[in-house]
């Protein structure tokens, strides 16, 4: 008689199935992590499932740094911590870790450790169908999930076309941002200078059809914590541009009533879109650095908010001799207000600007 065949599995990816196993997935993961192996483990995923008859079982995927040779069929046995019981798995070498991961992700609840190691093989005999992979990505619930699918199933595209893939998914998964909800009602701002209130009444007191073709903007200068930002943002639907200009569709909308330009230095705005934004110009294009050209509908005023002092004050900036022409243009397209006191009385707003 031939000698009995010795148990031997050699693979980078191990697929384990524990029938009728009552050990919780967290405990199973902990025990698998502690098993000594001559090759380092890179990733472990455990899935806890129940058959239709209620019988529990576990699946586990273990990925190693390199091929691991297992000659001990009891190596991956799990031990119950609540009773005297051992659970022995069916041990298989997996040709495609991606297929095993997809299989155990379908049902049950999972827990994992480490970083999944992507492979380029499929148990179906060839590359994963690109159409299947991209269809699955489109059905994902987030950009991150879609990218993970493509990383695991189409690694070549993921590496060579990553920028285009990410850009396309951002457009596909784009969701209109939730409207900003002001923390304080407009009625709490009780110290509004007359010139500011007149500007508000003149613009917001009319229907959109009755507003001028190019409304006048307003430049408000005041110390920090005077409430100017909260006041400006409480007036209605708006774009909030702070620190720099970003016309990405994720943060900038062509369907709002006005722009709030907050803490953007006058020198920066001069180099970018001073006349377009303060002058409420229509149908212009932004070519800001690091982004594709964006068409801006425009035709809405801007509330420019700034602090006093060199580099911040729009008044001081425009009073410089080299900005005389821009000064003359701006006084015909915006009104200036200097705050001498907070716009509110409540101490609750004292931490807001």
From Swiss-Prot:
Chain positions of motif RCR-3: 103-106
CC annotations in GO: host cell nucleus
Residues at which a divalent metal cation binds: 49, 57, 59, 107
Residues covered by the CRESS-DNA virus Rep endonuclease domain: 8-116
Active site: 103
GO BP term, example: DNA replication
Coiled-coil segments: none
Cofactor: Mg(2+); Mn(2+)
UniProt short sequence motif RCR-2, positions renumbered to this chain: 57-59
Subcellular location: Host nucleus
EC number: 2.7.7.-, 3.1.21.-
Metal-binding found in the keyword field: yes
Domain notes: There are 3 rolling circle replication (RCR) motifs. RCR-2 is probably involved in metal coordination. RCR-3 is required for phosphodiester bond cleavage for initiation of RCR.
Protein name: Replication-associated protein
Organism: Bean golden yellow mosaic virus (isolate Puerto Rico-Japan)
């Amino acid at each position: 008689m031939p000698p009995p065949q010795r148990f031997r599995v050699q693979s980078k990816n191990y697929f384990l199935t524990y029938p009728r196993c009552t050990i919780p997935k967290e405990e199973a993961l902990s025990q698998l992590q502690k098993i000594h192996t001559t090759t380092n483990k890179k990733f472990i995923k455990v899935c806890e499932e129940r058959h239709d008859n209620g019988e529990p079982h576990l699946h586990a995927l273990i990925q190693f740094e390199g091929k691991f040779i297992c000659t001990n069929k009891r190596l991956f046995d799990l031990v119950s911590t609540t009773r005297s019981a051992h659970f022995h798995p069916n041990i298989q070498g997996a040709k495609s870790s991606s297929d095993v991961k997809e299989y155990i992700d379908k049902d049950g609840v999972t827990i994992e450790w480490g970083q999944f190691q992507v492979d380029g093989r499929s148990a179906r005999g060839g590359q994963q169908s690109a159409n299947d992979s991209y269809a699955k990505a489109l059905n994902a619930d987030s950009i991150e999930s879609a990218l993970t699918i493509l990383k695991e199933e189409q690694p070549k595209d993921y590496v060579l076309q990553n920028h285009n893939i990410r850009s396309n998914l951002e457009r596909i998964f784009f969701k209109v941002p939730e409207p900003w909800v002001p923390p304080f009602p407009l009625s709490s701002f009780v110290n509004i200078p007359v010139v500011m209130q007149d500007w508000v009444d003149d613009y917001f007191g009319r229907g959109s059809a009755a507003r001028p073709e190019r409304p006048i903007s307003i430049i408000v200068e005041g110390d920090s914590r005077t409430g100017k930002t909260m006041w400006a943002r409480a007036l209605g639907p708006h774009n909030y541009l702070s620190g720099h200009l970003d016309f990405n569709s994720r943060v900038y909308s062509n369907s709002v009533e006005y722009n709030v330009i907050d803490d953007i230095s006058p020198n920066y705005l001069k180099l970018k879109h001073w006349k377009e934004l303060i002058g409420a110009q229509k149908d212009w294009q932004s070519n800001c650095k690091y982004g594709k050209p964006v068409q801006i509908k425009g035709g809405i005023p801007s509330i420019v908010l700034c602090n006093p002092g060199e580099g911040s004050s729009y008044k001081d900036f425009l009073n410089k001799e080299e900005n005389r022409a821009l000064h003359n243009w701006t006084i015909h397209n915006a009104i200036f207000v200097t705050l001498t006191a907070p716009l509110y009385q409540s101490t609750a707003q004292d931490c807001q600007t």
